[in-house]
């Protein structure tokens, strides 16, 4: 642990979520002082406390009620912090009776307010945002580029999902999510090019995050990762959608994702957009792994033809010295183990019968 880490104050928005709760645990283990924001529910409070308990951390985390649909509520949590992790994502727009016309509009407005609050704090050195790699589709945009159908040769940080391009299994609901994440990330990155930025902004478009959780239930993305084994058709349909959108299935273990966030915090200086995914397999690579691991199970398989999985042009985080601990197989295997522990998968059915394993 850095001897000065206890003097560093960090704000984590969305501290009750999948990534937020795990990040809080990691920060406490390193001795940082953490402010966590959450919505005003008892369930969120219990989730936010789960990370420190499971991680063995004894520190008490100050919890601040805040809502992205009322971004001014984040000011008390940001006050006095040197680093701010933007992990929270707006949702439930219709139910919230929001003044905004869309989730994307709400997300951009929230980003602007939070950036202003960070400036007014006079203490914030860096804002680090958990973006989504779904905003970086390498689909070719015929209108903009004059090229044909299909994918670019590589996926890179210069890619932005062309929302005018159709693809197999496209979802109007997911389009809203992509648009909100895309617009808010672009708004954040534009801050670096301002006249006199008061701090640095980093965005990490994450792959499908899986592997483990400190929550008491399996997060949605982990459910997607194990869907070929669980045979949950809706979750598996999402995997197929990602394959169509991205040309591959970018994966990252939650522990690696949080280590990457910490890496970006602890560097002397860093700004810009950096992908965070340890592997870019195809959906067939994933189902083949599960079929090999569990030969006695009827693993769901995609019927769509897939060419070569689109790979990243460069590993920008890797060039800075970051290394992933978990590859594709470790991510998938630990996801299955976690889902079984939490009851989302029947652990008894996962055991390979002797008659099969001895062949």
From Swiss-Prot:
InterPro entries xrefs: Epimerase_deHydtase (IPR001509), NAD(P)-bd_dom_sf (IPR036291), NAD(P)_dehydrat-like (IPR050425)
Protein name per Swiss-Prot or TrEMBL: NADPH HC-toxin reductase 2
Enzyme Commission designation: 1.3.1.-
Binding positions for NADP(+) per the UniProt entry: 39, 67-68, 87-89, 177, 181, 206-209, 221
Molecular-function GO terms, alphabetical: aldo-keto reductase (NADPH) activity; oxidoreductase activity
Keyword Zinc among UniProt keywords: no
Family: Belongs to the NAD(P)-dependent epimerase/dehydratase family.
Gene that this polypeptide is encoded by: Hm2
Biological process according to GO: defense response to fungus; toxin catabolic process
Pfam annotation, one family: Epimerase
Gene3D superfamilies recorded: NAD(P)-binding Rossmann-like Domain (3.40.50.720)
Note: Plants susceptible (e.g. cv. Pr, cv. K41, cv. K44 and cv. K61) to the fungus Cochliobolus carbonum race 1 contain a transposon insertion (Drone) in Hm1 and a deletion in Hm2 due to a loss of resistance. However, the compatible cultivar Missouri 21A (cv. MO21A) possesses other defects in Hm1 and Hm2 alleles coming from different mutational events.
Residues of the active site: 181 (proton donor)
Cited function: In tandem with Hm1, NADPH-dependent HC toxin reductase (HCTR), which inactivates HC toxin, a cyclic tetrapeptide produced by the fungus Cochliobolus carbonum to permit infection and acting as an inhibitor of host histone deacetylases (HDACs), thus conferring resistance against C.carbonum race 1 in resistant cultivars (e.g. cv. B73 and cv. Wisconsin 22). Catalyzes the production of 8-hydroxy derivative of HC-toxin via the reduction of the 8-keto group of 2-amino-9,10-epoxy-8-oxo-decanoic acid, an amino acid of the HC-toxin.
PANTHER family per record: NAD DEPENDENT EPIMERASE/DEHYDRATASE (PTHR10366), NAD-DEPENDENT EPIMERASE_DEHYDRATASE DOMAIN-CONTAINING PROTEIN (PTHR10366:SF738)
Phylogenetic lineage: Eukaryota, Viridiplantae, Streptophyta, Embryophyta, Tracheophyta
Annotated keywords: NADP, Oxidoreductase, Plant defense
Domain of life per record: Eukaryota
């Amino acid at each position: 642990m850095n001897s000065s880490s206890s003097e560093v104050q960090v704000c984590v928005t969305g501290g009750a979520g999948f990534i937020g709760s795990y990040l809080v645990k990691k920060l406490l283990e390193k001795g940082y002082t953490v402010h966590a924001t959450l919505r005003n529910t008892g369930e969120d409070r219990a989730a936010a406390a789960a990370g420190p308990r499971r991680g063995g951390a004894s520190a008490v985390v100050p919890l601040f009620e805040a809502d992205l649909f009322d971004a001014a509520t984040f000011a008390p949590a940001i006050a006095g912090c040197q680093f701010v992790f933007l992990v929270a994502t707006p949702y439930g727009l219709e139910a919230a009776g929001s003044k905004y016309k869309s989730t994307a509009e709400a997300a951009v407005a929230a980003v602007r307010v939070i950036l202003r609050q960070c400036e007014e704090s006079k203490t914030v050195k860096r804002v680090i945002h958990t973006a989504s790699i779904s905003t970086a589709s390498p689909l070719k945009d015929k209108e903009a580029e004059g090229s044909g159908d299909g994918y670019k040769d590589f996926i890179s940080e210069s890619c932005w999902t062309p929302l005018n391009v159709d693809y197999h299994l496209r979802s109007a609901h997911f389009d809203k999510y992509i648009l909100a994440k895309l617009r808010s990330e672009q708004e954040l990155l534009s801050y670096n090019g301002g006249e006199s930025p008061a701090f640095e902004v980093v965005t990490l478009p994450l792959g499908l995050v899986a592997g483990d959780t400190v929550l008491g239930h399996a997060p949605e993305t982990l459910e997607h990762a194990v869907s070929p084994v669980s045979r949950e058709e809706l979750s598996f349909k999402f995997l197929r959608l990602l394959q169509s959108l991205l040309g591959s299935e970018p994966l990252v273990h939650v522990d690696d994702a949080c280590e990457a966030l910490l890496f970006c915090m602890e560097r002397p200086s860093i700004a810009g957009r950096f992908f965070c995914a340890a592997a870019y397999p195809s959906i067939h690579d994933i189902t083949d792994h599960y079929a090999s691991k569990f030969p006695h199970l009827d693993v769901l398989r995609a019927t769509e033809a897939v060419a070569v999985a689109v790979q990243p042009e460069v590993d920008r985080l890797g060039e800075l010295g970051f290394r992933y601990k978990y590859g594709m197989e470790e991510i998938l295997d630990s996801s299955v183990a976690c889902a079984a522990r939490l009851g989302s998968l029947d652990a008894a059915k996962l055991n390979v019968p002797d008659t099969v394993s001895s062949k």
